[in-house]
A protein has these predicted regions:
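All-alpha prenyltransferase/terpene-synthase fold signal
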Residues: 1-148
Length: 148
């Protein structure tokens, strides 16, 4: 949660107000914010089970990182293709606030492809887990299929 986690991601976000970030910086910010939150939830659950080894924990971390980033990519996509009533916030607000987004950097189609690639990365990471990962797989799919 500190400077190497969510706080660091928030610092990047606040420092970027009115500026356009490059793709690497945008990804870093989102990995530290949403990615760190999802990583904590996934890995803490695994650690509580006391049945995972370091390799499995790393795979769950990769899963969480991919899903956290996919969530942000989908959020940026929805800001363009959805509507205010569905989103629960003003549609197009990212563009109005001059925020760096994946569609702005990659184009809408490129952002959609990025979200799908991150889903595939997440699902591939779960292959290292010898336990039932069905709920994690469903969550991963939900992240890029959600409408709000």
């Amino acid at each position: 949660a500190g400077p190497q986690g969510m706080v660091g991601g928030q610092a990047i976000d606040l420092g970027a107000v009115g500026e356009q970030l490059d793709l690497a910086t945008l990804e870093s910010m989102h990995r530290h914010k949403t990615g760190a939150l999802i990583r904590a939830a996934v890995q803490l659950g695994a650690l509580a089970s006391e049945q995972v080894d370091d390799e499995q924990l790393a795979a769950l971390g990769q899963y969480a990182d991919s899903i956290g980033l996919a969530f942000q990519v989908q959020d940026d996509i929805l800001d363009i293709i959805s509507d205010t009533a569905t989103l629960g916030k003003p549609q197009g607000s990212d563009q109005q606030l001059n925020k760096s987004t994946y569609p702005a950097l990659l184009g809408l189609e490129g952002a959609i492809n990025k979200a799908h690639a991150l889903l595939e990365e997440a699902l591939a990471a779960l292959e290292a887990i010898p336990y039932n990962t069905e709920l994690l797989e469903e969550f991963a799919r939900y992240v890029i299929e959600r409408k709000n």
